[in-house]
């Protein structure tokens, strides 16, 4: 589902199908990062930044415990990695994939990086940025949510079940 997208035909085009398949493949890469976080005892959230040609130019997973840094969220690490790769602070033609809806802090950073797209898996009803305001993101950033949502949600649920 996309926000504020122009009216489209109810019948998916081949471009829509290709984009969905690509989104799922790239969300699987973010899930690999989330699994790495889980293995490190971190909340399992993962993120990847993808260039317009489909190359992954930034990866990140939560490292708040290991780094003892409350800002070491998957998105922040992936964005910083991509900026280093490009040698630029703006990611205007890139797409950020993240397994869980970003928090307000990460949404603010995403706004300043200005990616073309933000794609997330599962919604975060407690601390996701949309609980505060959808206006945090840059107005030109296209948002898609719900990609592999069940897989993303299950990884989080399993992590918290294992910790109890």
Task: Give the label of every model feature segment.
Residues 1-40, 56, 102-164:
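Zinc-dependent deaminase
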Residues 30, 37, 74, 78-82:
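Stable alpha-helical structural segments in soluble proteins, enriched in small hydrophobic residues
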Residues 45-54:
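Short beta-strand scaffold segments in enzyme catalytic cores
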Residues 66-76:
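A short, polar/charged loop-to-alpha-helix boundary motif
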Residues 58-60:
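Short hydrophobic alpha-helix segments
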Residues 41-45, 92:
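Short, basic and Ser/Thr-rich N-terminal targeting/leader segments
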Residues 88-101:
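Immediate flanking context of iron-sulfur cluster ligation sites
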């Amino acid at each position: 589902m996309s926000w504020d997208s122009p009216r489209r035909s109810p019948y998916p085009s081949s471009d829509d199908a290709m984009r969905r398949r690509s989104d799922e493949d790239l969300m699987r890469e973010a899930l690999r990062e989330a699994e790495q976080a889980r293995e490190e005892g971190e909340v399992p959230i993962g993120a990847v930044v993808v260039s317009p040609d489909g190359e992954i130019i930034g990866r990140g997973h939560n490292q708040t415990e290991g780094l003892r840094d409350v800002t070491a969220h998957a998105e922040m690490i992936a964005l910083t990695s991509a900026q280093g790769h490009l040698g630029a602070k703006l990611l205007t033609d890139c797409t950020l994939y993240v397994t869980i809806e970003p928090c307000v802090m990460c949404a603010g950073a995403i706004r300043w990086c200005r990616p073309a797209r933000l794609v997330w898996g599962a919604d975060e009803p407690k601390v996701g940025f949309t609980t505060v305001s959808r206006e945090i993101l840059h107005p030109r950033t296209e948002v898609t949510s719900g990609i592999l949502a069940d897989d993303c949600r299950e990884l989080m649920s399993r992590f918290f079940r294992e910790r109890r």
